[in-house]
Amino acid sequence: MNTVNPVDRKRLTSWYSLYMSKADRMKVSTSIEDYLKAIWLIAKDASASTNALAEQLNVAAPSVSSMLGKLQDLGFVEHEPYHGVRLTPSGSRRALRLLRGHRLIETFLLEHLGYTWAEVHEEAERLEHAVSERFTERLADLLGHPTHDPHGDPIPGPAGDFPNTPNTPLAELEVGQILEV
């Protein structure tokens, strides 16, 4: 397990605080966080359509358009009508921080609290908005810094990076070769 010593952690935290924009540090609503995460899940580094967001969040398209204006004012997205929405670096950092917390919470619920695989997502959806970055990092420490959640999805690192996982097509594997899916 790779752990950061306290001195390096303090330096990293100081640097990160300077690096983060005011929008990154501000407290935002659960709804704003849900939109940022949905945009990231739909499009990652590309553009997401208003209709795809409406479907993902189970809301009406006009509601999406209204929220996109707010997100753009906050500096979280770049939105061009009829061309979709893209996260800014600030929006992407916020979305990945939320996604990291969500996936770590799912892992914790399954491994330590006896939740079933089918139950963890909904519970994590509620909890992800209430936990701090400090809590998330302590949770990662407790869990041994897992790289994937119970559903097999990769857990972003503290800096928003993803674990390096090989993507070998099944057709390229040897007959009888053992692998983990």
Label every model-predicted segment.
Residues 8-17, 128-181:
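Mid-protein regulatory/catalytic core that forms ligand/cofactor-binding pockets
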Residues 15-34, 172:
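Short alpha-helical segments that sit at the start of domains
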Residues 26-59:
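N-terminal helix-turn-helix DNA-binding core of bacterial DNA-binding proteins
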Residues 55, 72-73:
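Alpha-helical residues within the helix-turn-helix
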Residues 62:
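Key DNA-contact positions within bacterial/archaeal DNA-binding proteins
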Residues 73-80:
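A short, conserved structural fragment
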Residues 83-102:
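Basic, amphipathic "hinge/linker" alpha-helix immediately C-terminal to the N-terminal HTH DNA-binding motif
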